[in-house]
Amino acid sequence: MKQHLKNTFLLLPIAASLPVQAQDKNESPNLVFIMADQWRGDALGCLDKEPVQTPHLDQLASEGVLFTNAVSCYPVSSPARGILMSGMYPMNNKVIGNCNSDTAPYGVELPETARCWSDVLKDKNYRTGYIGKWHLDSPYKPYVDTYNNRGETAWNEWCPPERRHGFDFWVAYGTYDNHLNPMYWETAAPRDSFFYAHKWGPEYEVDRAIEFLSEQKKSSS
């Protein structure tokens, strides 16, 4: 008998391929979203425009739908993610630029009151998880002690549970570009209790995603 994950949703904001099992007709589908941060639209092997090799993404394109004439209305990290999460333009969701200490005085961060599709899924009793870069909260003093908060502009910030828009499981950071040794906050970790993975970021995040999906499969069997 086939075993299905029950009402599971995972957002993985990195480039990786993860299988989602088919659902019976009357069941809610399992969902895995994969979001790449500021990925050039033509940096895909299947488009033959750059000397890149992306076999897993090419497979996703061949087995699904590939848009070749689409644009982002604001192609930098925070605004693009804010648009995808909320379905609103930056002027409506308040994320009109990257979240950092320079834009913080202007309220540039995703409001807790914004209604995201992850909130909707949570209301539908999905078990939700987020792994990777979030970058939708403004840093505030005293800044978190990471390398990218020690210069003139602070960038990195913890996201408290009430601002996670329905995500139960959380292994994420604000923004942090040392991908050879990335840092994260776990679900229940307070602001001052982040950890370093000591591993290539995308590899670590895929491992945690597979672990999350496996646990959901076991709990629903």
What are these regions (language model features)?
Residues 12-16:
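Repetitive helical segments and hydrophobic/amphipathic motifs
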Residues 1, 18-20:
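Intrinsic low-complexity/disordered segments
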Residues 1-9:
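Bacterial N-terminal signal peptides that target proteins for export
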